């Protein structure tokens, strides 16, 4: 992932450890406090209740969708609802089988192991997970050379929760071992507005309903973006001595931050303008777009495209990406003129 993307206000990624700490303070602890994702919440409530009634560990859970939609938060909520401990890590952090063994060895019956970016697990680690997930054991090779021999190591029943922004990169054997698979969708403006108001209360910040809704409307359907914009708007409001924050203050702050009426920032607009100006809207190959706006192809696919596709400003074709008539109109142009 390009480091530059983490500096974007409208990026779904966590930009630094300070933001991670702030996110932690804003997180709900139980499903009843978790705003949005109603379908996912309802199904998880059923699965969790059933597992508790049977006194069994919850089936393994895969959460997938764009960054910033609350996958990590939901994993923590699941552990709280189950009343068990949770160990959190990420795919890149588990570099070798010994790292996985150390994590599994710390689990007690019913505990949750959460692996973020699970699509980035090394292949040798992923293969060790198969027996751990399916039959709750791992085989460890002890010794070296002629004396090396496998040792059967039983594990307590546990729940693996994997999170990914790239579900298509998961191997079929790993994906098939998740009994519960839930897609995290973009949030509605109404749900995001409730999140903004809840966060404002935690920040001890007054904001009116119109102001909260305007932040929600420009937050790209993403709670992390909504909270990040709220923090920056709070700065502008405090310097201006304005309380409560109203829609005029929100408009002023977001104009200064170059976040437009649809939640696009200067990089989104640069991407669209390049395609319109140099290729009459496309089709344009992903590698060409990446080279001209100075980003990696994976960053464009994961960070920029999903929202532009979601709001209908961009479409994918077999020959490349194309700007839609709505995308032309947003940039103040007509597709018929190109």
Curated annotation (Swiss-Prot):
**What InterPro entries does the entry give?**
AAA+_ATPase, AAA_lid_4, DNA_helicase_Holl-junc_RuvB, P-loop_NTPase, RuvB-like_N, RuvB_C, WH-like_DNA-bd_sf, WH_DNA-bd_sf
Where is region (Head domain (RuvB-H)) located? 261-338
Binding residue positions for DNA: 316, 321
Q: Which domain of life is it from?
A: Bacteria
- Gene Ontology CC annotation, any one: Holliday junction resolvase complex
- Which HAMAP family does the protein's record reference? DNA_HJ_migration_RuvB
Query: A Gene Ontology biological process annotation?
Result: DNA recombination
Principal place where this protein is found?
cytoplasm
Family per record: Belongs to the RuvB family.
Q: What GO MF annotations does this protein's record show?
A: ATP binding; ATP hydrolysis activity; four-way junction DNA binding; four-way junction helicase activity
Q: What is known of its domains?
A: Has 3 domains, the large (RuvB-L) and small ATPase (RuvB-S) domains and the C-terminal head (RuvB-H) domain. The head domain binds DNA, while the ATPase domains jointly bind ATP, ADP or are empty depending on the state of the subunit in the translocation cycle. During a single DNA translocation step the structure of each domain remains the same, but their relative positions change.
The segments labelled Large ATPase domain (RuvB-L) in the record are 4-187
Question: What does the record note on quaternary structure?
Answer: Homohexamer. Forms an RuvA(8)-RuvB(12)-Holliday junction (HJ) complex. HJ DNA is sandwiched between 2 RuvA tetramers; dsDNA enters through RuvA and exits via RuvB. An RuvB hexamer assembles on each DNA strand where it exits the tetramer. Each RuvB hexamer is contacted by two RuvA subunits (via domain III) on 2 adjacent RuvB subunits; this complex drives branch migration. In the full resolvosome a probable DNA-RuvA(4)-RuvB(12)-RuvC(2) complex forms which resolves the HJ.
Location in the cell: Cytoplasm
Per UniProt, which keywords does this protein have? Answer: ATP-binding, Cytoplasm, DNA damage, DNA recombination, DNA repair, DNA-binding, Hydrolase, Nucleotide-binding
Q: Which reaction does it catalyse?
A: ATP + H2O = ADP + phosphate + H(+)
Q: Where is this region: Small ATPAse domain (RuvB-S)?
A: 188-258
Q: What does this protein do?
A: The RuvA-RuvB-RuvC complex processes Holliday junction (HJ) DNA during genetic recombination and DNA repair, while the RuvA-RuvB complex plays an important role in the rescue of blocked DNA replication forks via replication fork reversal (RFR). RuvA specifically binds to HJ cruciform DNA, conferring on it an open structure. The RuvB hexamer acts as an ATP-dependent pump, pulling dsDNA into and through the RuvAB complex. RuvB forms 2 homohexamers on either side of HJ DNA bound by 1 or 2 RuvA tetramers; 4 subunits per hexamer contact DNA at a time.
Annotated binding of ATP, by residue: 26-27, 68, 71-73, 134-136, 177, 187, 224
**UniProt: Mg(2+) binding residues:** 72
Q: What is this protein called?
A: Holliday junction branch migration complex subunit RuvB
């Amino acid at each position: 992932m390009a480091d530059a993307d983490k500096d974007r206000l409208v990026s779904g990624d966590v930009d630094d450890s300070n933001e991670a700490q702030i996110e932690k303070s804003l997180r709900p602890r139980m499903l009843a406090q978790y705003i949005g994702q109603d379908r996912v919440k309802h199904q998880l409530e059923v699965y969790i209740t059933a597992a508790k009634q049977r006194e069994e560990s919850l089936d393994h859970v895969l959460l997938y969708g764009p960054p910033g939609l609350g996958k990590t938060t939901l994993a923590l909520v699941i552990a709280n609802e189950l009343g068990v401990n949770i160990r959190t890590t990420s795919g890149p952090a588990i570099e070798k089988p010994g790292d996985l063994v150390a994590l599994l060895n710390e689990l007690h019956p019913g505990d949750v192991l959460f692996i973020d970016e699970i699509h980035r697990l090394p292949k040798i680690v992923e293969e060790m997970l198969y027996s751990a997930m399916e039959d709750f054991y791992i085989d460890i090779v002890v010794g070296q050379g002629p004396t090396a021999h496998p040792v059967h190591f039983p594990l307590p029943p546990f729940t693996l929760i994997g999170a990914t922004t790239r579900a298509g990169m998961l191997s079929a054997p790993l994906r098939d071992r998740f009994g519960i698979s839930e897609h995290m969708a973009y949030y509605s403006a109404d749900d995001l507005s409730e999140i903004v108001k809840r966060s404002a209360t935690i920040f001890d910040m007054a904001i009116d309903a119109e102001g909260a809704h305007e932040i929600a409307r420009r937050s790209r359907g993403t709670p992390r973006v909504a909270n990040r914009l709220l923090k920056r708007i709070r700065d502008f409001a405090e310097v201006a001595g304005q309380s409560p924050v109203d829609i005029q203050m929100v408009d002023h702050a977001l104009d200064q931050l170059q976040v437009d009426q649809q939640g696009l920032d200067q990089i989104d607009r640069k991407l669209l303008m390049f395609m319109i100006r140099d290729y009459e809207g496309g089709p344009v190959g992903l590698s060409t777009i990446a080279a001209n706006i100075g980003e990696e192809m994976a960053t464009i696919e994961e960070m920029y495209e999903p929202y532009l596709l979601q709001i209908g400003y961009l479409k994918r074709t077999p020959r490349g990406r194309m700007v839609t008539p709505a995308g032309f109109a947003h940039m103040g142009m007509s597709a018929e003129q190109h």
